[in-house]
Amino acid sequence: MMSSLVLAAAMNVGTVGAASLPNRPVTTLELERYAGTWHEIAHLPLFFQRKCIDTITATYTPRADGTLAVHNACRTAKGMDASDGVARPTGGASGALQVRFAPRWLAWLPMVWADYWVIELDPDYRWAVVGSPSRKYLWVLSRTPSMDAGQFRAIRNRAAARGYPVERLVMAAPLD
């Protein structure tokens, strides 16, 4: 048991230590420009997305209190599914947000908030890459339902250089 834990820890250190690009949020994120609908191109496997087949979108709407309303939707075998949440700036780097999908009355609990870092962003906000400090989460998002294959490969390579396990990416949309 102990040798398994040591081996697992060594593997994680090696993965993160091998990163040649820093894993950190972008320094400039204009929430008004980021708002709107994004189409998911790819993501790391997550329990809460296990039933999503395709047509995965995230729509962000600015709210008066400086947060963003979040509406995630996807097509499942039984039709469309959706969930609503809130994203809030963390007060640190501009691209560092936290999201929650738990009810508002649970918002005071730290464990209902997840880190949502915009780690790469097209200057014209045509695509974005969202990750987390743990590298457990990774989404490649686009304003259009598909993405140029060359652009995706470049994004994937940079995510790998940041230490993300890109070999596990699940494709959610076609590449052009």
Show where each model-derived region lies.
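A beta-rich soluble binding module of mature secreted/lumenal proteins
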Residues: 2-3, 7-176
